[in-house]
Amino acid sequence: LDDDARYQSRRLERRFPGHPAGRLLPAAQLGASDAEVGLRAAGHSIKVIEATASSAADLGKVLQQLKTDRVAYWVLDLPEAQFAQAVQAAGSSALLFNASAGADALRGSQCAAMLFHSYPSQAMFSDALAQYLAARSWRNALVLQGPEAADQLQGQAWQRAAKRYGIKTVDTKAFKLSGDPRERDLSNTRLLTNDRNHDVVAVMDADGEFARTLPYATQQPRPVVGANGLVALAWHTQWERNGGPQVNRRFARLAQRPMVGQDWAAWVAVKSIAALVSDHSKAALPEQARLLRSGQVFVDGACMTQPQAPAE
């Protein structure tokens, strides 16, 4: 979407941890380029096209055109609210890959047979953080909870992960960024973090603006985790294993910026599509979906499976 709030210039300039750093087209193009030799050897090719809608109201026309043009693989970079529309439009005529939305509902109540996720869920991010805290024996967390619906969903995922890995929430305090003088205490980081009985401060801030200045601003000298400080990411530009430096360098040359998690998810989605086209081109799309779920499709030597949200 041209008016996608995640890509407003102000937000991109802030470079909030875990947020997109730019549109995902360069990452998809890199995935196709990286897969070109293998595809050519198998007698196949793929073409990356960009389909954009000016707004959510115009999205239906764009999706219908993709279906009319028989585009069989869609890499989605959409807000969560538009996924149901994309799934309905595609039906069984396209495989869909979510490359940027971490909402747990897309893996649960809104799960679809033809929808796969190359981008991790909020539950996965929360599990990663909780596992690390447990490994370091940082068992007591002060939670700073934002007021927005997305903040609440982050908080719910965190509480499930914390319970699973034995992280105790010693207190939950609400924060709010506001120009109202009567609410200034809700944005006072020193006041919010004044208690001494916690090992870490876990901040649930989907927007990122409050968390942006929280590290090193707490009253007690404690690590900040969640939306800033120690952040669970799908990818980092300094990852040095599994061919990471080479991928990062190729992407930086193409996009003129570092690769972030959403870029990696788009890249690996296209690589997954290339693997399907190369090895299972004669299979119908529902059968290709089954092969993806069964772990029989290999991407760069690793099994590609559909991430699932942990059970309650």
Predicted features, each with a name:
Residues 1-312:
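Extracytosolic ligand-binding ectodomains
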